[in-house]
């Protein structure tokens, strides 16, 4: 009844996010090494089908919760972490909450059909308007393949719009291919003539391939790839959790781009990684310029904007604990992640500048060009503003006019004086 609470909106953005919740669970499986192909099909009537080749969602009886796992997953909100077979652990780095995403999307659907291949059976589930119809069907299956296929149609009585544009799928699937190296996403999009157009997204080397694609060989410095894994915590009295990150970075004369991902979610509003990049780059590049004596006497220091103008950076991080600003996962706030990224980027930049002095020289020179051109543009803007302001100033338009003495805006006075 209130999709905005979970999906962030009851409009098309919320409907799109409900798709991402289902996709997330398939990505989690593939990232753990269970299947490397995810098929996504969009039909003209607005229905969507997502099929993975993972282990198949758990359907067996959960003794602890005294319910079947399929009920927890599809019918109970916030069941993520409760479900799971005895021999199937939860994911170390989870994108989907599995139990919030599946269940909330199911409740927001006109219908949902699920087929699960696992343990030598095909399990079938059918839901209508949030209700399971007919329980679960179990059919013996001799094939060796496993996986989950979910087809559903978002409910127009829940969302104000369910016509998800092609651009959404193309953007999301490309981004997921970028941060999930080696996983292939195959999109089939139904056309007006009922045929399907097929699109494939795959980056064997993940963010490194993506950075090279963006730069297209036209870069100031080559792409640098850094990675690390460490234990972090958000506060002294808080527990440690695991963080790993991959960073692709280059400088360009033409392109400026920063993209941050966490547990595969694109962080549209950045948060912790963005703050880390600003702090680390400003500190190290400023030191580089200062130590090489490139600042002129009394010159102002660079700002991050001067670095950003020529910086191409993509960060994909994963953690076992994450503080998102909300369920739409567009920004993270973890202090531990921010501090670790700041330290690691600082360290890698310092080593990079020492080991590649020619690149360091190019970066320092380009950042100073950006800074000085920005300052010149600002001076020109201020001078023009001053000139325009003066020309529009009514007090200076006609000489020898005396300012009004009355504070009453209803009064009007005009004095005409002959002579000087």
Labelled PLM ranges:
Residues 2, 20, 28-31, 35-47, ...:
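GHKL-family ATPase ATP-binding module
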Residues 2-19:
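Conserved short strand/loop->alpha-helix "switch" segment adjacent to the catalytic nucleotide/phosphoryl-transfer site
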Residues 11, 62-66, 203:
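Residue-level signature of the cytosolic catalytic core of signaling kinases
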Residues 57-79:
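Short conserved segment of the HATPase_c
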